[in-house]
Amino acid sequence: MEGWDKGTKSVVGEIPLLSTRAGPRDGEAWRQRLKEEYRALIAYTSVNKSKDNDWFRISAANPEGTRWEGTCWYVHNLRRYEFPLQFDIPVAYPQVAPEIELPTLDGKTHKMYRGGKICLTVHFKPLWAKNCPRFGIAHALCLGLAPWLAAEVPILVDSGMVKHKDDEAAPADAAAAASGSAAAS
């Protein structure tokens, strides 16, 4: 993991590696893999909370564990920007990494594919391939989504492509106040 900062290496070292090579079509082996995925996610979340770096919530959206949904956030200029997060587990998983989607950012950056899938091809996918099947969902979040958010959110905010929820509500509140004062006249 050359090129990663010490903090990232430290966190990745605390996420348990997975051992079961199984995908959604592998029956009982997939259920075992899901147990390992949950253990790794719980460990990663615990590490983040202990370091005051809590930045996502995620859970399986179906009983099979093939669809995942949640929320991730990034703090920029002391303001928290939240984004819905989703992805499907590919049929060829774990050989193929999940394609993480942030649908509300679709079309706002060049480092994203259609549908809001974040671009992970250059930096993350070779690392995933090298560490298959030991990497799982927690590793995809840590080494894929987290650096992507750190690189892209400040640019999107500074360019005006992403607005803080308080800034979006302010014009609507001002318009309501203006129409209220006009009605009172």
Curated annotation (Swiss-Prot):
Annotated signal sequence range: none
GO molecular function: UFM1 conjugating enzyme activity; UFM1 transferase activity
Biological processes per GO annotation: protein ufmylation; response to endoplasmic reticulum stress; reticulophagy
Coiled-coil region: none
Superkingdom as given in the UniProt entry: Eukaryota
Keywords of this entry: Ubl conjugation pathway
SUPFAM superfamilies: UBC-like (SSF54495)
Pfam families given in the database record: UFC1
Keyword Disulfide bond in record: no
Catalytic machinery residues: 119
PANTHER family cross-referenced by the UniProt entry: UBIQUITIN-FOLD MODIFIER-CONJUGATING ENZYME 1
Family that this chain belongs to: Belongs to the ubiquitin-conjugating enzyme family. UFC1 subfamily.
Function: E2-like enzyme which forms an intermediate with UFM1 via a thioester linkage.
Protein name (record): Ubiquitin-fold modifier-conjugating enzyme 1
